[in-house]
Swiss-Prot record:
<keyword id="KW-0378">Hydrolase</keyword>
<dbReference type="GO" id="GO:0006351">
    <property type="term" value="P:DNA-templated transcription"/>
</dbReference>
<dbReference type="InterPro" id="IPR009003">
    <property type="entry name" value="Peptidase_S1_PA"/>
</dbReference>
<feature type="site" description="Cleavage; by viral serine protease">
    <location>
        <begin position="132"/>
        <end position="133"/>
    </location>
</feature>
<dbReference type="GO" id="GO:0003723">
    <property type="term" value="F:RNA binding"/>
</dbReference>
<keyword id="KW-1133">Transmembrane helix</keyword>
<feature type="active site" description="For protease activity">
    <location>
        <position position="181"/>
    </location>
</feature>
<feature type="domain" description="RdRp catalytic">
    <location>
        <begin position="692"/>
        <end position="806"/>
    </location>
</feature>
<dbReference type="GO" id="GO:0003968">
    <property type="term" value="F:RNA-directed RNA polymerase activity"/>
</dbReference>
<keyword id="KW-0548">Nucleotidyltransferase</keyword>
<dbReference type="GO" id="GO:0000166">
    <property type="term" value="F:nucleotide binding"/>
</dbReference>
<dbReference type="GO" id="GO:0006508">
    <property type="term" value="P:proteolysis"/>
</dbReference>
<feature type="transmembrane region" description="Helical">
    <location>
        <begin position="10"/>
        <end position="30"/>
    </location>
</feature>
<keyword id="KW-0696">RNA-directed RNA polymerase</keyword>
<dbReference type="InterPro" id="IPR043502">
    <property type="entry name" value="DNA/RNA_pol_sf"/>
</dbReference>
<keyword id="KW-0808">Transferase</keyword>
<keyword id="KW-0472">Membrane</keyword>
Amino acid sequence: MYHPGRSPSFLITLANVICAAILFDIHTGGYQPGSLIPIVAWMTPFVTLLWLSASFATYLYKYVRTRLLPEEKVARVYYTAQSAPYFDPALGVMMQFAPSHGGASIEVQVNPSWISLLGGSLKINGDDASNESAVLGSFYSSVKPGDEPASLVAIKSGPQTIGFGCRTKIDGDDCLFTANHVWNNSMRPTALAKRGKQVAIEDWETPLSCDHKMLDFVVVRVPKHVWSKLGVKATQLVCPSDKDAVTCYGGSSSDNLLSGTGVCSKVDFSWKLTHSCPTAAGWSGTPIYSSRGVVGMHVGFEDIGKLNRGVNAFYVSNYLLRSQETLPPELSVIEIPFEDVETRSYEFIEVEIKGRGKAKLGKREFAWIPESGKYWADDDDDSLPPPPKVVDGKMVWSSAQETVAEPLNLPAGGRVKALAALSQLAGYDFKEGEAASTRGMPLRFVGQSACKFRELCRKDTPDEVLRATRVFPELSDFSWPERGSKAELHSLLLQAGKFNPTGIPRNLEGACQNLLERYPASKSCYCLRGEAWSFDAVYEEVCKKAQSAEINEKASPGVPLSRLASTNKDLLKRHLELVALCVTERLFLLSEAEDLLDESPVDLVRRGLCDPVRLFVKQEPHASRKVREGRFRLISSVSLVDQLVERMLFGPQNQLEIAEWEHIPSKPGMGLSLRQQAKSLFDDLRVKHSRCPAAEADISGFDWSVQDWELWADVEMRIVLGGFGHKLAKAAQNRFSCFMNSVFQLSDGTLIEQQLPGIMKSGSYCTSSTNSRIRCLMAELIGSPWCIAMGDDSVEGWVDGAKDKYMRLGHTCKDYKPCATTISGRLYEVEFCSHVIREDRCWLASWPKTLFKYLSEGKWFFEDLERDVSSSPHWPRIRHYVVGNTPSPHKTNLQNQSPRYGEEVDKTTVNQGYSEHSGSPGHSIEEAQEPEAAPFCCEAASVYPGWGVHGPYCSGDYGSLT
């Protein structure tokens, strides 16, 4: 505790007070002179003064020496966010921050749970011009130097990697293929790099490029010594298939690479594809690799955080940059005249390709834009080649091809030069033989042909299928059919015996008029317009079509050209001029022939108006009951010459219907492998179903029950829709007359004549289009308010008594049932074209046949099976079995793949014990739990309880058939 008596100041003050008291006493005389006390009393103040002086001096000294400094404070340093969160493939969620006191910004890794804040900033680079996007749920892997594809190369601008590309061949040139926005932008490329080494870019030529955002590519001619120095090898560009497993590569340098895997998907537009591989800054132009090669090139994002976009490299290389006229068939892309673009209901994109010109790109079509801005087919007749002239009974072309420079003799009912050679090649020996059959469609043997085909034996069911039957009992219902002329004849007699000729319905004209309103008008082939055709112009167009991607190169050319080559490819390679001349001459004959209705099928062949139709058994698994019965599926192979005749007459019309499938009743252009196409179809059916409940009809042996009046109705509608002139209309009518009056040929050369008009020939170019329109016409005739058809498959508005009405039209309807709905009457599921279609998914219903064929092939291509069956609810167990029991080199990393579109097991189906093998259609859970309802007045009402007791359209009276 503090005590004041212990303080020096207190003691000094006390001593001075005492001394002051003593001095006061001295002053008042209290002490005697000579006493020492006054001296001591004076000394104390003096010492005190000295002490004070010394203390003050000390204070001054310390004061002067003490430095006054600014107050020290704790400095608060903080950083301000300069960007929204973005995604880095190696580090995760990142942000840019700048310090409050100034200075360079820093990159900070933030909490991964903040992924929800990414939003639109999934674009990797963070700036608005970025083309790159991460894909949520995807992963990246580090790639060791040297493990990347040998064709991959990095494109540098100084130390920064601005893109990637690959070495490949474009139209025969060895080149670099990359994105145009990588090669031609503000950051000029300075070097190509591979495995940590780089070579400076010089003034290399870029002969082909396109700067359109949707078709972003450039072709760079890189010297071979550069490729050699870098150790870069060429890769091939391959046609993408839907759901290809693909990989993309990228990174900050060529020896610090990451890879991202995903699935490649085709879209409606063939020049474009989408993929789910994640990308990062500087990945533009990177090749999209599948196990087969490069399927595309990454150019940007399609849907931020979900899907990226690529250019279909195979399409660009083989359709837009190819200098040869012949186009590959893989993508089923066709070139159309520029004037036909305006007949399509969807938008084409217009692109300019440096080194090729301007083009319009559609879904599965493209057209080159004429440089003059005017299509040459729009020229006046005076500017077209002169028409042929008749001189002394001979038709002469003033500018004929060298191979037909001589005047061609065209006497009435005769043949021209090339067709005469064709007939001589066939070696027909026509003779009137005995009747082959008098039941249904009467048939008669009429001779032999010198054009014969190999007689093959039936294929045995392999052990692989027998073993799989223990796991998939559905496979036991299939086997391979018999082959050869004996099987062909037996099946022909069975099929034709079911033909039931009928009269023309009284309401046919009105039904045709109603149907015409649902189809678009088309334009005919430009060289067949007007009444004066140019032989040279027709011949030139035939040559183009013969070399187009539309022709199946692997198919047989039919009778009699199979004597020259076994495939269309080999035939056209060696004898293009002969084929084109035969087609051209036949077109002119068809446009002039009269009174063909009085001619027999043999007479039509003799006159050179058509060729025999070859019959053969289709090599696909057949139901065992059909094999036991000997009722095999026959293909009616129409000759290549007749196919090209049909393409010339009806090609533009059929192509328009394919392009417009979403807007017309006929669906030959439909492709259910794409999710958006299946959804578009189901949405359309749901709307139609709300008008009149949907029903599925199964017509037995449709091709063999087609009536002549149905074929005549189709060709007359074609003439109206195409605006055919008189000459073209006559050619079309005569072609159909030949079409419905055929001579069939078996593999051993036996010729058989049909003696009544009718029957659809399955190998015709018009089969899908004509069958679809006839099928819609049938629905119109029985009173269905709507119908869609793909060949003989249909979904239509319900009609009571439909089976009997179809029978009166000559068609046996073995099954007619309403489509599955929910308890509220909403459309739930349809089966169409062997596919089960629902609102959010679609899968192949005939998977047992596909699996049987796959296991029987002996060549294990897992990707083919996956492409066809992966959307089925049975795919997980199929994949599990195939991966473990077949020796395919293509099955890698399959067990851990994430489910594909439609792959997840359908819980609705499983919960109800639905088996496709049993043939019972699946219904919704709501239907399964539906309580027993009151009696209904008709079958339709019992299936659509939401419509009430009476159901929709109960009367069923939709037009007279007699």
